[in-house]
């Protein structure tokens, strides 16, 4: 898939105010500071499309970007940023859950995982919750360029082992690096394949 057009449409905290229409939506979510904004900018080829920050927890809104005038890329708030405080975390959780459970246009959720880390309980519990609610999702391992030698393979294998404890069939997964544009083609082709399937119905 070639992205010829990517434009910001709207930010909000209320799923009912998300764009009308039937365009499929591909949402991106992950723990704070997982590299979500950098990944979105890399995928779209637009350096400043999503705001990047070294400070975790900056994305507090549901952000819609219209891609090729045919589908939406949705940037969801990051989860698990403790310094927001309990009230702030609850507000973010409500925004995330409302979008994921109520937004009919959401076609696939991409869960971003920092490939530098061992399996994190918060990520595994979030994916288990997705499974319990029948939410279609794929995993994107980020920051692959930060690991040397066989560490990347070891970390991903550890995650897959943990997932197999919960899942009979593993969700699709992709390995990416925003710095090296690794995985861009694979993720976009995956989105394109789903769009083609939807259009054939």
From Swiss-Prot:
GO biological process, one term: division septum assembly
Identification of the protein by name: Probable GTP-binding protein EngB
Coiled-coil ranges per UniProt: none
Residues that coordinate or bind Mg(2+): 37, 59
Stated role: Necessary for normal cell division and for the maintenance of normal septation.
Residues reported to bind GTP: 30-37, 57-61, 75-78, 142-145, 175-178
Organism superkingdom: Bacteria
Family per similarity comment: Belongs to the TRAFAC class TrmE-Era-EngA-EngB-Septin-like GTPase superfamily. EngB GTPase family.
Molecular function in Gene Ontology: GTP binding; metal ion binding
Species, as recorded: Bacteroides fragilis (strain YCH46)
EngB-type G domain location: 22-197
Keyword terms, alphabetized: Cell cycle, Cell division, GTP-binding, Magnesium, Metal-binding, Nucleotide-binding, Septation
Keyword Nucleotidyltransferase recorded: no
Cofactor: Mg(2+)
């Amino acid at each position: 898939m070639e992205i010829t057009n990517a434009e910001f449409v709207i930010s909000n905290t209320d799923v009912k105010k998300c764009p009308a229409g039937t365009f499929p939506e591909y949402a991106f979510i992950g723990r704070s500071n997982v590299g979500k904004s950098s990944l979105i900018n890399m995928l779209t080829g637009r350096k400043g499309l999503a705001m990047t920050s070294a400070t975790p927890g900056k994305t507090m809104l549901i952000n819609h970007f219209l891609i090729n005038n045919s589908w939406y890329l949705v940037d969801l708030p990051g989860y698990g940023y403790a310094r927001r405080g309990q009230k702030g975390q609850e507000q973010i959780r409500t925004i995330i859950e409302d979008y994921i459970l109520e937004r009919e246009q959401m076609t696939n959720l991409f869960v971003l995982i920092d490939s530098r880390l061992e399996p994190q309980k918060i990520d595994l519990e979030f994916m288990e919750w997705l499974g319990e609610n029948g939410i279609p999702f794929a995993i994107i391992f980020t920051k692959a360029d930060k690991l040397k030698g066989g560490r990347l393979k070891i970390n991903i294998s550890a995650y897959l082992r943990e997932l197999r404890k919960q899942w009979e069939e593993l969700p699709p997964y992709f390995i990416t690096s925003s710095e090296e544009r690794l995985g861009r083609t694979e993720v976009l082709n995956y989105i394109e394949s789903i769009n083609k399937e939807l259009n054939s119905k």
